[in-house]
């Protein structure tokens, strides 16, 4: 079973349920080596996945700063684009591209020291200028959707590269959630500054042919608009992922996805939008397939009240309902 390899590939896929076909989709060198370690290194691991997105929007959403399409696609973005920060397994914010950071006394200026020696997938060096432009480009490219991923993008006053590896982020007011929102690859994934026009709009034609990030994978083209292919980033600065490449097949119907998995066309499905509870229960009992439900998920759910309702317009009623909910259950 390749569940560990799958997990190593999709570092951003924090989804509720997943199904995986057991066995291998590996290409091996026809000349067998006497050394088992060399044989293992000769294997090329490829995964086939399936999603329901409207891929006519894919090339815009693959740009981190543009968010006018499916939220599901954002799960893949950290495979291509690193962020300044991320959450560790304990839910704490830790640096990724940011090596060190500080905040001014008034809480309106953050200073980030950027790690050195990191390259984009096109081989160019990551510098503070790339980080500053990526941040400034967020509200420009989000446009009418600015603020849809959090408040930070609405209070950016400026982002300045003060030297080759130092960035200052200036806000119009203090904001407690700044570092947490900088963990989001959409919209705060770091992109090569060469991929923005002078007005900071993204060069969409460039993103039709490549991804320009520092993440473990990069875009490798599509097959007639039905399958999108991704391979390892040869310039990746971190530990090389165990999966060499993966493809995302466009299969809009969930039953067709399950059939494709049974036929060996798809290796992995994840998320409740791709796998119904009934299909999950069925495949969990089927030989040759692995099933896993995440025990932890970094998501927020809320219940909103319709204040125009005669019942819920009464604050006492709302407080009574809120008090009756066991929040520790």
Question: Where are each of the predicted segments found?
Answer:
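Surface-exposed binding/hinge segments that line
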Residues: 148-196
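Aromatic- and charge-enriched surface segment that lines or borders ligand/interaction sites
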Residues: 99-144, 168, 260, 311-313
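Extracellular/periplasmic solute-recognition and catalytic clefts
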Residues: 160, 220-231, 247-309, 319, ...
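Short, well-ordered beta-strand elements
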Residues: 43-54, 109-112, 131-135, 167-169, ...
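Alpha-helical secondary-structure segments
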Residues: 127-134, 164-170, 215-216, 243-245, ...
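Short, low-complexity disordered leader/linker segments with a strong preference
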Residues: 1-46, 92, 103, 151, ...
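N-terminal lobe/hinge region of extracytoplasmic solute-binding protein
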Residues: 50-103, 136, 212-213
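Gly/Pro-rich hinge or "lid" segments in bacterial periplasmic/extracellular proteins
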Residues: 71, 88, 184-241, 245
């Amino acid at each position: 079973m390749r569940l560990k390899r799958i997990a190593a590939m999709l570092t951003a896929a924090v989804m509720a349920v997943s199904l995986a076909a057991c066995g291998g989709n590996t290409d091996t060198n026809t000349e067998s080596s006497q050394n088992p370690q060399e044989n293992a290194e000769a294997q090329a691991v490829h995964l086939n996945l399936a999603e329901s997105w409207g891929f006519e929007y894919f090339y815009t959403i693959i740009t981190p700063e543009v968010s006018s399409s499916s939220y599901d696609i954002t799960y893949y973005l950290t495979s291509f684009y690193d962020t300044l920060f991320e959450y560790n397994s304990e839910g704490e914010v830790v640096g990724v591209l940011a090596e060190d950071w500080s905040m001014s006394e008034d809480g309106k200026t953050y200073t980030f020291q950027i790690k050195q020696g990191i390259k984009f997938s096109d081989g160019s060096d990551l510098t503070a200028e790339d980080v500053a432009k990526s941040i400034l480009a967020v509200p420009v490219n989000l446009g009418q959707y600015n603020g849809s991923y959090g408040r930070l993008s609405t209070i950016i006053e400026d982002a300045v590269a003060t030297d080759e590896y130092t960035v200052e982020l200036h806000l119009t007011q203090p904001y407690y959630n700044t570092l947490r929102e900088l963990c989001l690859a959409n919209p705060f994934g770091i992109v090569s500054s060469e991929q923005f026009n002078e007005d900071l709009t993204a060069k969409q034609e460039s993103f039709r042919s490549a991804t320009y990030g520092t993440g473990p994978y990069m875009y490798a083209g599509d097959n007639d608009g039905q399958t999108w292919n991704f391979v390892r980033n040869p310039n990746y600065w971190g530990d090389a992922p165990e999966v060499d490449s993966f493809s995302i097949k466009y299969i809009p119907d969930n039953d067709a996805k399950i059939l494709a998995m049974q036929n060996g066309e798809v290796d992995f499905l994840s998320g409740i939008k791709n796998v119904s509870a009934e299909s999950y229960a069925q495949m969990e009992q089927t030989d040759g397939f692995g099933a896993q439900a995440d025990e932890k998920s970094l998501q927020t759910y809320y219940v909103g009240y319709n204040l125009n309702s005669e019942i819920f317009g009464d604050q006492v009623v709302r407080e009574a309902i809120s008090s009756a909910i066991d929040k520790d259950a």
